[in-house]
Amino acid sequence: MSTSQSSEQTLNYQWDVCLSNMVVQSGIGLGAGIVSSVLFFRRAAWPVWGGLGFGLGKSYADSNARLRTFHAIPKQLPASSTQKKD
């Protein structure tokens, strides 16, 4: 039996995905900036900020595309512990 999800639950799920992508991708960009700064640029600060900027920009673009497309929303959201399981 399929239960329908409210639009509020769907939007909350999409925002959760976008925020987790932002944390992960900005962390990856920051890490890549730190590594490149230490190895190649004699500990300059600009590669760190550039990597962080690339990570945040990538996550913004992904979130923008995810929130604007209708078919990107999954039909069945993962069940949370507060929902009744049948």
Swiss-Prot record:
GO CC entries? MICOS complex; mitochondrial crista junction; mitochondrion
Could you tell me which residue ranges are on the Mitochondrial intermembrane side of the membrane?
Answer: 42-86
Look up the domain of life of the source.
Eukaryota
Q: Which UniProt keywords apply?
A: Membrane, Mitochondrion, Mitochondrion inner membrane, Transmembrane, Transmembrane helix
Q: Main subcellular localization, coarse class? A: mitochondrion
UniProt keyword Membrane, yes or no: yes
* Protein name listed in UniProt: MICOS complex subunit mic10
At the highest ranks, the source species' classification is: Eukaryota, Fungi, Dikarya, Ascomycota, Taphrinomycotina
The record's section on Pfam families has: DUF543
